[in-house]
A protein has these predicted regions:
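Structural motif
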Residues: 35-46, 79-89, 121-130
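Short, charge-rich amphipathic segments
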Residues: 22-26, 43, 49
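Short loop/turn segments that connect beta-strands within beta-propeller blades
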Residues: 91-94
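Repeated scaffold domains used in trafficking and secretory/extracellular systems
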Residues: 2-27, 31, 55-69, 74, ...
Length: 133
């Protein structure tokens, strides 16, 4: 298992060996589960300091850590690889919120976080996480 210290806003990609990623005093652990026909490994994830298994699987690509608390990840229901949904995870508290769509292109802008799906053109700008559930 690879050990990574994440940096804010820098996408992380992990391989089939899995990874333990540390970020601002918290950790998230990824364990390989499967790889779909199109590639890109999928992992189960756990927050070891909270002893919490996350109830979804996470693609091991384009993992983006934000602020001191959050991970933005591409997720799927356990046992599947589609449909993909972006979820914002507070890795310190074990809480998460679905963004109800898949956003594969993320950029940090002056007015917030711009999330875009390059395939269907949908765009979401997050200025705060206060209203996410």
């Amino acid at each position: 298992m690879e050990f990574i210290i994440a940096e804010e806003g820098i996408p992380q990609n992990i391989g089939c060996q899995g990874a333990l990623i540390a970020y601002y005093g918290s950790e998230i652990e990824f364990h390989y589960e499967t790889v779909p026909l199109h590639g890109d490994e999928i992992f189960s994830a756990k927050l070891p300091l909270l002893e919490l298994e996350l109830p979804f699987w996470i693609y091991g690509r384009n993992l983006i850590f934000l602020d001191a608390y959050y991970l933005l990840a591409e997720t799927v229901k356990i046992g599947t690889w589609d449909p993909i949904t972006s979820i914002l995870i507070n890795i310190h508290m074990g809480k998460y919120a679905s963004l109800d769509h898949w956003y594969n292109n993320i950029s940090i802008e002056q007015d917030g976080l711009e999330l875009k799906n390059d395939y269907d053109g949908q765009v979401l700008t997050l200025k705060t996480v206060d209203n996410l559930h």
